[in-house]
Amino acid sequence: MSGTKWTDEQRQAIFTKNCNLLVAAGAGAGKTAVLVQRIIEKILDKEEPIDIDKLLVVTFTNAAAAEMRERIGDAISKGLDEDPESKVLRKQLTLLNKSNIMTIHSFCLQVIKNNFHTMEIDPNFRICDETEGILMKQEAIDELFDELYEIENEDFINLVESYASRKDTRLQEVVLELHRFAKSAPFPYTWLLNMAEGFNVGENFNFEETLWADMIMEDMKVLLYGFKNMLQQSIDVILNSEGIDYYYEPFKMDLSFINSLLEKSSFKEFRGEIIAYDFPKLPLKRNKDADKEAKERVKKLRDKVKKKIVELKNILDSYENEFIKKEFIFLYPSMKALSNLVILFDKKYEAKKRERDLIDFNDIEHLCLSILTDKNSDGHIIPSDIALNYRKKFAEVLIDEYQDSNLVQEVIMSMVSRVKGYWSFYNGQLIFNEKEINLEEPQIGLDIPNRFMVGDVKQSIYRFRQAKPEIFLDKYNEYNEEEDRKNRKVKLFKNFRSREEVINGVNYLFKQIMSKTIGELDYTEEEALKVGASYGEEVKGEPIELCLMDKKYEISEEVLKEYNVDEEEALDNIQLEGRLVAKKIQKLVGNNLEGGLKVFDKKLGEYRNLQYRDIVILMRATSNWAPVFVEELAKEGIPVFADTNSGYFDTAEIKTMISLLQIIDNPLQDIPLLSVLRSPIASFTDDELIDIRMVNKNITFYECMEIIYRLYKNEKLDSYYSFYIEDENKINKIIKDMNEKLKNKICSFIEKLKLWREKSIHIDIDEFIWFLYVETGYYGYAGALQAGEQRQANLRILFQRAKQYAKTSYKGLFNFINFINKLKFSSGDMGSAKILGENENVVRIMSIHKSKGLEFPVVILSGTGKNFNMTDLNKNILFHRDLGYGPDYVDTERRIAYPSLVKNIIKNKIRLETLSEEMRILYVALTRAREKLIITGLINNMDKTVEDWLNLSEDKNKVPEYAVMSGKTYLDWIGPALIKHKDAVSFREELKMTSELSNIVDDKSKWKIELWNKRELLKEKVEEDEVEISEKIKETLMSLEESNYKEEIYKRLSFKYKYDNASSIPTKLSVSDVKKQFILDEKENTEELFKKLELRKPMFMEEKKKISPSERGTIIHLFMQHLDLKKAENEEDIKEQINRLIEREFITYEQSKVISPYKILKFCRGELGKRILNSNNVNKEMPFSIEIPALEIYKELDKEIYKNEKLIIQGVIDCYFEEEDGLVLLDYKTDYVNDIEEIKNRYEIQIKYYEEALNRITGKNVKDKYLYLFSVDNYIKID
């Protein structure tokens, strides 16, 4: 069925059978297409066809599952077009709706629902909302701590004193974090107890024989390899330099010592030799012919090695067995208590969920696991009877994005796949043993392996979610590429996305820096990407650009004056980089007529000018950087949108509304109260607030207002308030002197607040918040501000959060505020509401994680000089899935605390894993680019940094591993790799680097390294001659006498402009304006198009009205823009699409009522709907601008004078699609129809300009033009 020309490797991935198949698919290798084609081939196999519901296809996201289902459906439908009578195809199309193409969580949920009777859960369970989960966890941990305090549990008290700092909230955070971490293990309780027992060492404990000792030795050996290279480099210099040969022997001894250490396999011997070694002294010979520069260079290198070896000696000297044993014995009670505390918390949390018949996100996987697993008599974990039934059901299990699997998911998939073996614990770790297991029933026909796993370990970037790339790597290293193996692998490294220039650059860089130590994979020629995309010869590719700027570049006062720039313009680092990027974008886009970059448009099949939407700016994290970049790009007139995950709670409108909720809950809070009083909700001035505070400075602000209110209303003060009034006469005088307006303002606010407090008790929180929006007018006010649409969208998100909260078992304003505060200070903060469509012509800023799976013509990777985030390493207890706990040693009696030995080991392990993750994140970022890649970054002290890079260039094939290990930024990796590239010569010369490189790399990759300074980014210099001319004109005018210019002034003031009529004609018109002009009565003139502006109340102040015909038309057009005809088979499908628009906040529920699913379905089933479905090129809501003669519209103008006058006509084409013999133009109309001819006449001119625009833009013929009339559910053709 497929017309795609597959590569040999892709064909192997599609057609290989009867084995466990691991497909390593590099970036842009078309893995989704291969996976889909494999499924299609399975279900259409002529010899052994498999029904699609007999396949289990596990995807990473719901979107991926939907896309895969859609692709398979399209393929089957195309097959039916070719063979309409095919029963097999019809059957598969029917079964597609109940196919098992889903995320791992959807599959687990399916298992639970089908087998709930085996668990102690109510069949009517529901999945716990995140909101409810947060509140329940907090409630559970608060109750647990209170109970343990009450019974004075000794282990708990010791834990609090050791690890809780001043408040026990820190220990609560440790428990919650460890609980979340343990849930990524298949059997959390077992893992927790095993990790604590790791500290329970006996008298025979020997540290030198432990895994920890081996890890220390292996980590140190990575550094020793670096020292070896440095010493070998020194020896080469000694042998090739004049007069320093007497250094040879001591350097040779040092090198022999390092080589001996590298050969050691025993930690005891390794430690002993390092501690015992003394570096021989260098001879003090003087030789006047000696090469002093070479001598100094080798001495510096040796000193560096000596210093590092001394550091290693000191570390190893502290690893004395008895000391370590005592440390473990001391820590054991605390670690056991911590594990037990987490288990107690989990049980309490579980009880709360069961009370409410809830399960949470983690429960889904663990409940499924418990259903699918059993233990045999040996204690091994084997498939349950239910799992064996799934093995019989599924002919193949296909797993997408396999590199992001965690251990729980791996065990689940192994239970339902036909794999031989069992899981068991060994040294506290869960290990898979590929051996036969005895099952009660023989598994006839189920002994043929049936797992298909596809992914790219170089793109495994979710370790923070406990993804375990080692699962993929273990199979990758174990499986064989040979045919007829039961465990086989196929490599798909041909990239069909990027230009050769991008691929060559990525390959060069990662061959230099990625290794098993950092990246967990050696990036060899075998692992490198291969060019698979063709971009033709019309436009040549460009080199990858690296744009660097020195943070310490100082600008003198003279330069600031020369460029007419304030000292306040001294930009911070992020602004500098943002401005640099803005200038690069301006150069790339050009003026869209010439000078800009040309990119290939796959849809058009040709090159076109680069647009803003083609550009993405990627960042490791967007929280602090994106807003600054947005500001800098906006200053340069570049449309930009930042897709961030933070900052929502910092927006003014949300802060104000949360403050209002806080004071409604409890008005005795000065900061939120003042926030509300200063806001438009209350509109108090600073002077008015000062007057209120003068009542009493020792009570809350609300109490001051309450006293004023009661005395002004002649109400008696109760004893509470009387207590705070020392001098009633003084208070009365203050209130008497207060102006009436302020007193009325206070009374009005107090009365409203009391009303709101009362109302909050009686209605749900979401209703109450919307009531406040309307009552205060704040929703409308926010919409009237700059970026009003964005602000209102943010307020709607708060309302939606409240709506979710209202569905939980928690009620009340107090709990909702607690929940919001919890979100603020956890990872629950989200970015501002998204109000931008996918097709908007803007530059996008997003995190690298969000870009995964996407591609862009131009990628700008920014912030490469920013330090990696290693803050987690500073916590007082670290956790590692394999090594367990890494606590500080805290002796409260002796008041000493320091990192324990095991903490230092785990800290280093986590640091290396974090660096490996960062390496893969960098790989993901660079492989998003199709045609152009730009990298930007700031460097602290350019000269010193580049000199350091040069010192790391001894091996032209690889940046030394020790250097990669010590990297703190992406530039620390990129710089040493590029400095030795042949394209860096001019860069080194620009920096006047005198050090000669013996290892210049002549690689085929193309790079352009630019050095920027702050001067280039300052405002453009004011031309001196312009200033001089201005001054001369001023002097001349001042010297003129009245008689010389009085007559000229009168002459100029009475001047009549020749083109006066043109001054009232707009330079731009919409198509709708043109249509109105043409249907005006002949007596009417052009000016009636532009009526006098009528001021009206803002919508939020007006009474609620019915939706107008104009609004109705807008809503229906919006729906048609987002309508997916492939998913519109019945009215229910259309209702689902309407609901999706409501959820995404494109329309409100009230607005959705104007959309008739019946009428939409009639369109979909009609001739035009079918033609759209059959077209491969459908475009919706396409904006355009075309230039036409002004006389074409304004016929009353003087033809001679205005013959060259032009107008811009702009509009938006609802829909056009392409068929074999031309384009079809379609415009939707919601007007009421009396006369078809009248409608045709009304819109004829509009359609004419749409046709002309399409002809000009696409260069293709418009063969048919239609109006679709929703009022009569039919279309008319425009001739």
Swiss-Prot record:
Say yes or no: keyword Glycoprotein present.
no
Cellular component, GO annotation: cytosol; DNA helicase complex
> Any idea where the UvrD-like helicase ATP-binding domain is?
4-499
Pfam annotation, one family: UvrD-helicase
Catalysed conversion reaction: Couples ATP hydrolysis with the unwinding of duplex DNA by translocating in the 3'-5' direction; ATP + H2O = ADP + phosphate + H(+)
Tell me where the signal peptide lies: none
Where ATP binds, per the record, is at 25-32
GO MF entries: 3'-5' DNA helicase activity; 3'-5' exonuclease activity; ATP binding; ATP hydrolysis activity; double-stranded DNA binding
- EC number from the UniProt entry: 3.1.-.-, 5.6.2.4
**Which residue range or ranges hold the UvrD-like helicase C-terminal domain?**
526-853
- List this protein's GO terms for biological process: double-strand break repair via homologous recombination
Which PROSITE patterns does the record associate with it? UVRD_HELICASE_ATP_BIND, UVRD_HELICASE_CTER
- Stated role: The heterodimer acts as both an ATP-dependent DNA helicase and an ATP-dependent, dual-direction single-stranded exonuclease. Recognizes the chi site generating a DNA molecule suitable for the initiation of homologous recombination. The AddA nuclease domain is required for chi fragment generation; this subunit has the helicase and 3' -> 5' nuclease activities.
Q: What is this protein called?
A: ATP-dependent helicase/nuclease subunit A
